[in-house]
């Protein structure tokens, strides 16, 4: 098992959220390397994050992807792990992981993260990256947690999807949407 977790979020770097998530990972296994993809994703912008992950997944080490852009935190949305030929992708069930999964050959299985032994007890319900996603990512990356112990297997068709909007082409115009602009304007 690869001891690399690639981590992307919309947390920014102005408070301690990224450091706390990395701290949870380190407390589970100090030898896990955390590769930061980006923490500058615009807040709650699932579309931007999904496209960023689609572009990045081809170049980051295989292993575990921990991606958290989660406007539905604190609701009944599921916390999930998706298996692919690339590795395991962990995050909220809001479509964030779909394009990255498709880029590496598609989802094979999905599991709900519900094993209480790997959920950090918490007062509030607003930091699932710390309390749920990071412990499962670290447990799996370290070999301490097997996929079948995550929780129940989910039907792939029941996962929330994010689809790229199509362009509308006529004889006189093309209508589309700019989906992603990097720091250099590309």
What are the language-model segments listed below?
Residues 7, 11, 30, 138:
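Short acidic/glycine-rich loops and adjacent helix/strand connectors
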Residues 1-19:
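A short, flexible N-terminal coil/short beta segment enriched in small residues
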Residues 4, 16, 28, 34, ...:
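Active-site histidine-anchored catalytic micro-motif
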Residues 106, 111, 120-186:
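Anionic-ligand-binding alpha/beta catalytic cores of soluble enzymes and soluble regulatory domains
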Residues 25, 29, 57, 61, ...:
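Structural signal for hydrophobic packing residues in well-ordered secondary-structure cores
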Residues 11-15, 72-74, 181-186:
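Short acidic, Gly/Ser-rich segments with clustered Asp/Glu that frequently serve as metal-coordination loops
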Residues 50-53:
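N-terminal active-site wall of soluble small-molecule enzyme domains
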Residues 17-25, 182:
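Short, solvent-exposed amphipathic alpha-helices that sit
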